[in-house]
Amino acid sequence: MSLLGTINPNLNPARAVGAQGDAEGAAPVSGGEPMPIFEGNDSARTSDTALDKLGKDESKYDEQIAEAEVTRLAQQLTRQSTRFSVSQNAENPFLETKEDSTLNPLGPNFKAKNWMKNLLALTSRDPERHPRREAGVSFRNLSVHGYGSPTDYQKDVFNMVLQVGALFRAVTGTGKQKIQILRDFDGLVKSGEMLVVLGRPGSGCSTFLKTLAGEMNGIYMDDKSDLNYQGIPAKQMRRQFRGEAIYNAETDVHFPQLSVGDTLKFAALTRCPRNRFPGVSREQYATHMRDVVMAMLGLTHTINTRVGNDFVRGVSGGERKRVSIAEATLSGSPLQCWDNSTRGLDSANALEFCKTLNLMTKYAGATVAVAIYQASQSAYDVFDKVTVLYEGRQIYFGRTDEAKEFFTTMGFECPERQTTADFLTSLTSPSERIVKKGYEGKVPRTPDEFAAAWKNSEAYAKLIREIEEYNREFPLGGESVQKFVESRRAMQAKNQRVGSPYTVSIYEQVRLCMIRGFQRLKGDSSLTMSQLIGNFIMALIIGSVFYNLQHDTSSFYSRGALLFFAVLLNAFSSALEILTLYAQRPIVEKQARYAMYHPFAEAIASMLCDMPYKITNAIIFNITLYFMTNLRREPGPFFVFLLFTFVTTMTMSMLFRTIAASSRTLSQALVPAAILILGLVIYTGFTIPTRNMLGWSRWMNYLDPIAYGFESLMVNEFHNTKWKCSSAELIPNYEGASLANKICSTVGAVAGSEYVYGDDYLEQSFQYYESHKWRNLGIMFAFMVFFLATYLTATEYISEAKSKGEVLLFRRGHYSRGAADVETHNEVSATEKTNESSDGAGAAIQRQEAIFHWQDVCYDIKIKGEPRRILDHVDGWVKPGTCTALMGVSGAGKTTLLDVLATRVTMGVVTGEMLVDGRLRDQSFQRKTGYVQQQDLHLHTTTVREALRFSAILRQPAHVSRQEKLDYVEEVIKLLGMEAYADAVVGVPGEGLNVEQRKRLTIGVELAAKPQLLLFLDEPTSGLDSQTSWSILDLIDTLTKHGQAILCTIHQPSAMLFQRFDRLLFLAKGGKTVYFGEIGERSSTLASYFERNGAPKLPVEANPAEWMLEVIGAAPGSHSDIDWPAVWRESPEREAVRNHLAELKSTLSQKSVDSSHSDESSFKEFAAPFSVQLYECLVRVFSQYWRTPVYIYSKAVLCILTSLYIGFSFFHAENSRQGLQNQMFSIFMLMTIFGNLVQQIMPNFVTQRALYEARERPSKAYSWKAFMTANILVELPWNALMSVIIFVCWYYPIGLYRNAEPTDSVHERGALMWLLILSFLLFTSTFAHMMIAGIELAETGGNLANLLFSLCLIFCGVLATPETLPGFWIFMYRVSPFTYLVSGMLATGVGRTTAVCEKVEFLHLTPPANTTCYDYMSDYIGSFGGYLENDNATDSCSFCQISSTDTFLSAVSSYYEDRWRNFGIMWAFIVFNIAAAVFIYWLARVPKGSRSKN
């Protein structure tokens, strides 16, 4: 569907102009109605699409006349004189600015046909400048395969260990199983033709379209396959002409922050040709093309609206689909493949989409292939050709008007009112195809037999002749290839290489991506501003913690800690870029497939677009920090500080981007990122100075970019400076003692001097030298360039992981025989089973006796302060053994009525009577009814049988024994025909149950609850293909036969589906009733009502559901002057309904209540007692964890690697001053796994909560207290296991156990250390639950938790001791849980043992004359501790400031005797977290209506 083709190479003027003729009519569509896209009502500009503008009120299309007209005009156009006369009358639409021109897409009189006619005439003036570019396609013996396994086992914590061999086989490629997806396809789609691809989900439609478009990611063509793109070989098409054949996937991925106008203008600019019309700039061209496409697709009114997505508000889903269509249109591809692009659209909009495609092919000569799962007859008739797929076999390819006859001649029967598309697809389902009498043994049955019948037919032979003729006309590598290359070259920028698939130059690609990048930033400026403000606040907090540091030696440690913090915060400010890159990756890959730009061009642009933010952030953060803390206040050092912090930011940004681009999934990126960050922090040079790094690990420091930045910042602060020793640090501090006999206690001090030189301090403490400062800058630049190169390379060549094809997963040991055949050859037996078992199961299905009826139901809510009525006096009833359809236009209130009747609304005012057997509903009503939601919400780790059992145990009455409930579940499984996959895992779409199996399970979960009153179903067939919809209706039929009362909403069913309902409740806009009553045989009762009241007669072939919408004026393009809700209110039918309701109320209320089980529990809100609720929830959540080995193993791997990394980095730390500091930092660094553990816990909780709140809470399965308690308790055993892992991997390598040996308390202190680690992990998990309890998104909860975690770390007493904290912040030191945790672990780990100085830590001072060192220092040692290395020396004393580790502990306000108290305080924090989590959930998430009840 190439609109760009109209001016570029893609034209066939003869076909295009001829197809429209001279009349101002609709573009003709074979067999269909005039397209609603031409010449519309000017007053309805925003709602009419341009398809409305090309011709209303036109006569029906006569195909023969049109073909004659095409021939006549084609002959005219071959004559040059005629061509020039057409051309000379043409105007240039790009330069047309008149408001009322029919060529102005923004004007009220725009006509797409006139615009196209002018454009075609213009391009025909100069065919060399605008050469034709067409790409029809022929294929012979097309076979495609992939690798994988048809069935797999679900992984859990135990059997994951058994996967090591499988992993090895996967890596070596020896374990691959070849799976044939497509077998021997043949076909021909010429330029200007449309092909519809029909088949059930899983039949190979998507693979076929991807193959045609050259998207061979994970799939492979067999060697014998021949593809001919009008002379171009498949490899050349994929490589050199990638954007000329495109695949439009079912999903709509766009940048949500961009407006629709900006999104489409970008697409137009990236494919803007070099050879434009004279005087038309690139900007004019792109803007005009965008406006034309938006006008044609009815998007003009959304030009400034954000595209949005599931989380960002923007245009509607239908409009977003049209944005995808417009983007593909603007790509200008002559061959387009559309995969189920009508999903989610009603039949009217689907038809409009098909007609749009038809218009494009007829005018622009594009080649289009479309897969549609539900096609109305009108939509089907738009296409030229059809191919039918059956489990990877092609069973037909040919003209759409010949397909039905091909199969009816073979012996199959098409039921009355079944559309041709449904008939063709039904042939691939053994349970649905109907064989004519006398043909039972003659017709094909299996896919292979169907394929053989097709191959042996005359239609196939004719197709092969056409393909051979086409291939002779366009031989591979023939003249047409050169013409195509020349036409591409006419489009490409001058400096773009000939073999490139891209249109604009690399410079232009980067420029356009940059413009778009700034538009995205503008569209989401709040995020950027919040990040800047957040970093500024963090700078203020840290600046206040280290506020106005003294310029003396007492600030040495604080300055080091401050610079360490500063360089880390700058370095890791880009860590979130990993998430950002993953969010945009599908969009970039899609647009690269459209050949809009190189992925690396977007990568360069995104870096450049981030620069203003990074520079602004660096200035704001670093200036605030620098001047608040009194760092070196000289111009030179200040700018050097800014330079190095910014270069660190940029270098680490490149590193994080490389990680993101090099991995195929987010989880692959996050685990190495977590370990990498830990390593970068430890080996920066502050936590372990370089002189203390172990020889085998020193290389990590060399590979740490942050280490070079930290060294330069330290040198920048201390080089060439002189620091006065504070009076408290002069040793000994005797009054009257001479300075010559004193020394400053700081490393680098010289005896007899009250000053310490910064260079001496750096050299002796860290082995840092001034000569390294600028060398380090060069090294950092080298790192930056290296990571930049790897990032750009990875971006260009590594694509995102693609999902596997549909496979069933089973629990190990529960594999069902024949399960692999569930979707293949066992269909017949599965159908027979359903029919056989239904009678047996009927005895178990509870036959409902109660009648649910309602009268005058109204529902009012306030929207923006204005009252609005959603439902308006709705009456009706549902009786046992009947199925009532609830229909209406979009927005009529169908789902709202279901929610109101099912007591599921939590806001607004509901009035009217809703009665069960004439009595008001009690609080057990919700659990006594089943409600099948439109979305199939299930826990992905559970099996089908477990999901049903969970529902039965918790929702069936308490007096029913557990065994009876389990037996009933087996009956439900038989009834639903789910035996073959009863032990299959639900999984996620694509890896687990398919769409139909999910829908059956959704219904089964409600049936398992044994609903005593009725079953509500909301859109059970929405988004399903026709065959799956039919099987769901089969199921509903079975249920009604067994006495179930069913009320079911349905959206525009086919005629055959509609006939299967007993009654209809039909709503108009505003929730007003249009009809309630019997449907009747062949819809006669319904049709009679409407016809009597002024509706046109129902045509024999019409779909009553669509006819009904047209009658009331609710279908697109229809209008009604009759007020149908008013007609209903005055009708005798409504009077009869009211009388019957009054009769039901009076007679049923006299019925005696069944007292056999009407004890108190029958009327309780929940069927099961709290203990049963909690037990079942615990079992399910624990099994979810057990069956999510990725979660458990990633948690374990994180704990093991982090603990070992820290343990061996600080291996056997000595009890020297630096060694004790290292041991303190080993505890401090262990705290950093907090953030990663929180990020792992929150998504699991959100998954459980989403299921509970959407399905299980409204159905009263269990209470919110059981839900919260189970989710908190399930973490306990895993945290206990992780605490053992951390204890072993961390405690012993560091050697903390050795400090307990002198006091003979190894066991007691080891046990306490393990308990403290356990309390840390429990605090982490309960804190995560507290943070996420009231918050919707795991990302938001994670960010908030990390912010609070950072504050806890800053104020825990390690980086800034309580003595150095400003008075204002002391409260934070006291409320930080890590204060007590670190203090308890430090005291337990190093207390009550001797300390020994390293050689460099001894202070060398001179005693007074004739005095021994011992005599001189004994008083000081008695007061402050320490020891002398040489007691009797008289010339130079070597003094160590600490002799006991308790001296070190007291310096950081940690005391050995407080260790058990600190453990108790940690438990107080844990209890607080649990209480707060429960309270926050109750406050934020429990609906007001149920707060008093739950």
Curated annotation (Swiss-Prot):
Region (Disordered): 1-48, 84-105
UniProt subcellular location: Cell membrane
Any Pfam family the entry gives: ABC_trans_N
Bilayer topology: Multi-pass membrane protein
SUPFAM superfamilies in the record: P-loop containing nucleoside triphosphate hydrolases
Chief site of localization: membrane
Effect of inactivating the gene: Leads to strong miconazole susceptibility.
Biased composition (Polar residues): 1-11
Swiss-Prot/TrEMBL induction comment: Expression is highly up-regulated in azole resistant strains and in the presence of miconazole.
Catalysis performed (reactions): (R)-miconazole(in) + ATP + H2O = (R)-miconazole(out) + ADP + phosphate + H(+)
GO molecular function: ABC-type transporter activity; ATP binding; ATP hydrolysis activity
Residue numbers binding ATP: 888-895
GO cellular component, one term: plasma membrane
Domain ABC transporter: 162-416, 852-1095
Transmembrane annotation, as ranges: 527-547, 561-581, 636-656, 669-689, 778-798, 1191-1211, 1227-1247, 1276-1296, 1312-1332, 1351-1371, 1463-1483
Keywords in alphabetical order: ATP-binding, Cell membrane, Glycoprotein, Membrane, Nucleotide-binding, Repeat, Transmembrane, Transmembrane helix, Transport
Origin: domain of life: Eukaryota
InterPro entries listed in its UniProt record: AAA+_ATPase, ABC2_TM, ABC_trans_N, ABC_transporter-like_ATP-bd, ABC_transporter-like_CS, ABCG_dom, ABCG_PDR_1, ABCG_PDR_2
Glycan-modified residues: 41, 141, 340, 622, 835, 1410, 1432
Family: Belongs to the ABC transporter superfamily. ABCG family. PDR (TC 3.A.1.205) subfamily.
Free-text function comment from the UniProt entry: Pleiotropic ABC efflux transporter involved in the basal level of azole susceptibility. Confers resistance to miconazole and clotrimazole.
Identification of the protein by name: ABC multidrug transporter atrG
